[in-house]
Structures are given as C-alpha cells and as structure tokens.
C-alpha cells in the first residue's frame, strides 16, 4: 500500500498525512498519529474505550519482534488491525478513524512529559 492509496482510503475522514516509518507508514491527522500501515495491513489506535469493537471483530494488535528479544518474544503496540471490510467502506472507515484519533488524543494526555534534571 502506498501513500496515495492511504490518502484515498481516508478521504471520507478528512486530510491525512502518511509518513514513512520503518517498512510502512504512520498515518497522521493534524500532527497526531492515529493509524499505521505495516505489511499492507491497516492498524488503528485503540484504548480501553475502543478495544471492545476490535475484539468483537476478532482483530488483534500489531506486534513486532523486539530488537535483541530472546525466545521469539514480541512487543505489542496499542494499534489493532482494522477489519478488512473497512477497505471498501469509506464512511465506516471514517467512523473508526475518528474513534482511533480520539484514542490517540486520550493516550497523549496520559503520557507525562519527562522532567529535566538540573
């Protein structure tokens, strides 16, 4: 999936900016990352308020092999696979994207800013 396809997919949601990240893309709205594309698969930001929708669809989280991890250990991120039907349903994708953006905003508020040592 390329950057043009990502912008096209989210047209009903509004303007997005795909940025290259590793072997995929981070998808941003007004500077906030709310989705990622890895291995041609779309993942949306999830939190405790939106997780049930992903679970009801039988979707799972984005995982990756942690650098230097032993025993095949994988890291789990708070981005969950979007249901495949959303690729062909722009209005429904827009609704899921709004929820993902809201989850990203809630997550950003919880992350404390590092304190500076003097």
Where is each model-derived feature located?
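Charge-dense, helix-prone N-terminal extensions
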Residues: 1-118
């Amino acid at each position: 999936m390329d950057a043009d396809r990502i912008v096209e997919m989210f047209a009903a949601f509004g303007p997005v900016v795909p940025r290259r990240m590793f072997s995929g893309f981070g998808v941003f709205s007004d500077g906030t990352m709310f989705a990622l594309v890895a291995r041609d698969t779309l993942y949306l930001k999830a939190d405790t308020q939106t997780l049930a929708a992903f679970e009801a669809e039988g979707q799972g989280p984005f995982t990756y092999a942690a650098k230097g991890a032993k025993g095949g250990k994988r890291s789990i991120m708070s981005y969950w696979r979007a249901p495949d039907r959303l690729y062909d349903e722009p209005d429904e994708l827009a609704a899921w994207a709004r929820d993902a953006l809201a989850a990203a905003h809630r997550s950003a508020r919880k992350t404390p800013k590092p304190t500076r040592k003097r």
